Amino acid sequence: MTNQPTEIAIVGGGMVGGALALGLAQHGFAVTVIEHAEPAPFVADSQPDVRISAISAASVSLLKGLGVWDAVQAMRCHPYRRLETWEWETAHVVFDAAELKLPLLGYMVENTVLQQALWQALEAHPKVTLRVPGSLIALHRHDDLQELELKGGEVIRAKLVIGADGANSQVRQMAGIGVHAWQYAQSCMLISVQCENDPGDSTWQQFTPDGPRAFLPLFDNWASLVWYDSPARIRQLQNMNMAQLQAEIAKHFPSRLGYVTPLAAGAFPLTRRHALQYVQPGLALVGDAAHTIHPLAGQGVNLGYRDVDALIDVLVNARSYGEAWASYPVLKRYQMRRMADNFIMQSGMDLFYAGFSNNLPPLRFMRNLGLMAAERAGVLKRQALKYALGL
């Protein structure tokens, strides 16, 4: 059994954990990242990853600050400048970058592209140690240090352990941190399609009685479709071949989609989780390990990047003032900054989900009236967009 000391151990080196590790290393912390496997290498002429993230303007700024955005753009991403949502054709809400005098709202980025860009930067940084493949099997606290036991017998001792290991976080579970959680009565299917026409720079979402249908433009003539429906219906779609799925898309997506050819699909259930606490002495949770959200507005990874920004700021400031930066009072500052914001965003998505998953005629009328009012709200609409973009 080997015993390796480090300042900070991060379990999970994905989009959020990788960004956090890089940011902390750039501020001089010695960081060890524990990850099951390296991200898949980027292949330039491959079809897109089914998993797509809508990266907001604020998240792009964070990634630029970390020095990885050029690598993302050198692989591939696609800007979007307009976001539109509606149920009735007479009740559209349109958010446009021009309203905020911005060049764009954000970028559509494949998860594997973002992971690869971050991983390359982590491999090159002298303050980062990568443990891959690495699997956490036990976590204990001794003498103000966290001891992480890995499969194979290696023990890593760290002042601070950070769980960035996703919705089913082992760090959270091993720390005994509970969650508020429930399953939505919906599942989600992601479908990579080739479009007959240029997908453009607008992303849109139509609410239907069965669940939303969304369109995310990608590079070249590629796009991603998002189909929300009952778990039984999504299972039915999963069992179809691509020709059958193409026919279902034509029936159930709005005509503005045009002719598309599906080439890959994946599905997952929708669950809401919120950790009862984000921190303990020498321990913190970030991203999906702390909170998951209905993907309706594409805010999941952006909330994770807000966590990253806040935690880096708290730790760097505490160290600069000579404080015990891994102590509970310091880490509690991070929780105070992020927990309420994440709860507000979760609750907003829950309100949308509840409001648009009921088909009583009076409620349908009221919610479409609400969309019409939102479109005409002017300053309020712009403030809502700025909040969603993290500006």
UniProtKB/Swiss-Prot annotation:
One GO cellular component, as annotated: ubiquinone biosynthesis complex
Family: Belongs to the UbiH/COQ6 family.
Protein name: 3-demethoxyubiquinol 3-hydroxylase
One GO BP: ubiquinone biosynthetic process
Compartments, as annotated in UniProt: Cytoplasm
Gene3D superfamilies per record: FAD/NAD(P)-binding domain
Gene: ubiF
Presence of keyword Cytoplasm: yes
